[in-house]
Amino acid sequence: MCMSQFPIEFQIECAASTINHARDIYAKFILQPLSYTQALTMGNSLRRVLLSELESISITAVRIAGASHELATLKGVREDVLQIMLNLKQIVWRGQLKKQPTITRLKVQGPAIVTAAAFQSEANSSANIIDTCQYIATIDTQDILEMECQLEQSSGYRLAKPSEMIDWLPIDGVFMPVKRVNFWVDKALVDKVLVDKALHLEIWTNGSISPQEALHQAARILTHWFNPLQTLEWKTSHTKNEQTMAQLSNMLIEELDLSVRAYNCLKRAQIHSVADLMQYTQEELLALKNFGQKSVEEVNKALEQKLHCQLKKYVD
């Protein structure tokens, strides 16, 4: 490989950065100078990793006092259980879980508007809520809304699975801190001169991670994937075919445990070793005197059992 194809001075610039909302952060990066194929390869690779491989925290199950299924309604609560679960799914968490799963609890007495700020995580949890104003439900009476939520950390989108725990309702896990990625390739401006190409990369996150950190993690993941390819050691041992041929040359047809009829026919044809036998096709063996189809099948069965191979049917 010609290393001169790669730029000597690779530059990356954060051209724009905007916090539209606690759960909506945007940044644009320019990577230059690159050839067109380099920019396209980097853009595609980074986009796929950003959207599917970065980890985050999500609620994956909930247990609500007084609710046994998703279609249940709760006394004094305006939303049904299904709507509450959809609202819980929108909560964005930041941090690292010290253990999985982690339980977070909520208990509010009405009348009240319940938001994510009401959650209390376990003492040893480092998970924090990005937007504590995230709406969950409204209690119109003096009734109590009480629930426990199960937090997990992973990557990608995971469909809800039936919970083995009693009264727990599963929720789809959204472990996707990056909401959207866009890229395109354009001319690069270096020292006021247009040279080569530039990769323009736009990243939108849900606030649990900054676009800069997302890009850093994606690059680290790609490096981890590709690094082993630089130190591959190819074994120079014999191939399977070479090993099989070595076995054939040293093995006599007596070791195939053939019937007396088949054995005698082969011996009369001056076939003494398995290597000799493998020079024949099934069609050629059938041409031998007193060697019929049953004998051919017997030979093939013996070869399969002993050496995991068979005779060719016809001459190539």
UniProtKB/Swiss-Prot annotation:
It is found in: Plastid, Chloroplast. The keyword Nucleotidyltransferase applies. The keyword Cell membrane does not apply. Keywords: Chloroplast, DNA-directed RNA polymerase, Nucleotidyltransferase, Plastid, Transcription, Transferase. Residues 245-316 are annotated as: Alpha C-terminal domain (alpha-CTD). One of its GO terms (cellular component) is chloroplast. It catalyses: RNA(n) + a ribonucleoside 5'-triphosphate = RNA(n+1) + diphosphate. InterPro entries: DNA-dir_RNA_pol_insert, DNA-dir_RNA_pol_RpoA/D/Rpb3, DNA-dir_RpoA, RBP11-like, RNAP_asu_C, RNApol_insert_sf. It is an enzyme of class 2 (transferase). Signal peptide: none annotated. GO terms for molecular function: DNA binding; DNA-directed RNA polymerase activity; protein dimerization activity. Pfam families: RNA_pol_A_bac, RNA_pol_A_CTD, RNA_pol_L. Belongs to the RNA polymerase alpha chain family. NCBIfam families: PRK05182.2-5 (NF003519), rpoA (TIGR02027). In plastids the minimal PEP RNA polymerase catalytic core is composed of four subunits: alpha, beta, beta', and beta''. When a (nuclear-encoded) sigma factor is associated with the core the holoenzyme is formed, which can initiate transcription. DNA-dependent RNA polymerase catalyzes the transcription of DNA into RNA using the four ribonucleoside triphosphates as substrates. The N-terminal domain is essential for RNAP assembly and basal transcription, whereas the C-terminal domain is involved in interaction with transcriptional regulators and with upstream promoter elements. This is DNA-directed RNA polymerase subunit alpha. It comes from Cyanidioschyzon merolae (strain NIES-3377 / 10D). The gene is rpoA.
